[in-house]
């Protein structure tokens, strides 16, 4: 087993290797003067079980091309099996036709990864579970819920916690966390009038006196969560904390979170935190290295990955 990484999230790749007690593979990923990407694998991978850790996060297109070229380099170097480890799968929100004459980009990206030569995909909290079916190769979608649930238990009295979905579409994810915490569930019903804007409408469930835990897979602009926090506090919640798997945090999201009613935003390191995120007073990062590392180990040993969530 050998683990390699592109440039998107080397800190996470190094942490995964530390968990596995293996060195990070020696590979060069650089750009020519015209910004073409060049990859060179600097050690023998012939006959090896290779894992490439690469989030296709901002800049998504550059990191995607790095991944594709690394897969191609491994295939041409006679690796026995190539697993693309995608802590964050970019383009996942483009999982359906949004209107006439629009693409399904998530499917296209899945095809590209497959055609480049990947034999298997390992990813975390896909935006929509059915994206697994976009790949024509085995795909394991891991869940961050055990990590998030453990952190909630470490920081809150679960007897007073209520898990809240920020929209109707996230109810399944919220229910899974509430089951792990053995607590009640509430829903924020919102209306999105136009792209980039969200308006909180009302809260379904009695949150009065509760420590509310908002749960979602992605925070991008932060508008939905900040508005949801305000609505919950108006309904009598004692505090509101958001637990989000993927901290995209584009544009002015970090500043928006910092000035919001959120007690804290907890994200994973599926996307490498920026300096702004690391210095924010109310944003905290929890590691997925153990989860991803164990999944990689089980894959290499031909053991069950689903057993991680039993």
UniProtKB/Swiss-Prot annotation:
SUPFAM superfamilies: PRTase-like
Residues holding Mg(2+) 2: 167
Binding site for D-ribose 5-phosphate: 192, 216, 220-224
Biological processes, Gene Ontology terms: 5-phosphoribose 1-diphosphate biosynthetic process; purine nucleotide biosynthetic process; ribonucleoside monophosphate biosynthetic process
InterPro entries in the record: PRib_PP_synth_CS, Pribosyltran_N, PRibTrfase_dom, PRTase-like, Rib-P_diPkinase, Rib-P_diPkinase_bac
Catalytic activity: D-ribose 5-phosphate + ATP = 5-phospho-alpha-D-ribose 1-diphosphate + AMP + H(+)
Entry GO terms, CC: cytoplasm; ribose phosphate diphosphokinase complex
Positions of the catalytic residues: 190
A Gene Ontology molecular function term of the record: magnesium ion binding
Coiled coil ranges: none
Keyword Nucleotide-binding found: yes
Cofactor comment text: Binds 2 Mg(2+) ions per subunit.
Pathway: Metabolic intermediate biosynthesis; 5-phospho-alpha-D-ribose 1-diphosphate biosynthesis; 5-phospho-alpha-D-ribose 1-diphosphate from D-ribose 5-phosphate (route I): step 1/1
Primary localisation category: cytoplasm
UniProt-annotated binding residues for ATP: 34-36, 93-94
Enzyme Commission number, as recorded: 2.7.6.1
UniProt keyword list: ATP-binding, Cytoplasm, Kinase, Magnesium, Metal-binding, Nucleotide biosynthesis, Nucleotide-binding, Transferase
Oligomeric and partner information: Homohexamer.
Name of the protein in question: Ribose-phosphate pyrophosphokinase
Species whose genome carries this gene: Agrobacterium fabrum (strain C58 / ATCC 33970)
Gene: prs
